[in-house]
């Protein structure tokens, strides 16, 4: 897959704000500095990436420590939709 664009849903943005307010702003910074560049190049593969089973549409998970970031990929338009974050 060529470069994939990243789109943050409103729910995901709310989750990130909550993460930052709870004193974990470094997690949000790491997401933007390290995770997004990786997802732009290889959204399906990586040491912290896992495809979730039995989800429709297909949903992927990126893990940073105890945090999980969930996203869906539009293969046709080459967009990764960041849909939720959870601890």
Name these PLM-found stretches.
Residues 1-66, 75-81:
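Basic, Lys/Arg-enriched alpha-helical interface segments
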Residues 69:
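NAD-dependent ADP-ribosyltransferases
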Residues 84-87:
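Short beta-strand-loop-alpha-helix junction that forms the active-site gateway
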């Amino acid at each position: 897959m060529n470069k994939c664009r990243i789109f943050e849903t409103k729910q995901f943005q709310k989750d990130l704000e909550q993460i930052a307010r709870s004193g974990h702003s470094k997690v949000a910074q790491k997401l933007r500095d390290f995770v997004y560049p990786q997802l732009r190049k290889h959204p399906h593969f990586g040491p912290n990436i896992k495809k979730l089973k039995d989800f429709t549409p297909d949903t992927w998970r990126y893990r940073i420590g105890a945090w999980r970031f969930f996203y869906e990929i539009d293969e046709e338009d080459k967009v990764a939709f960041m849909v939720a974050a959870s601890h």
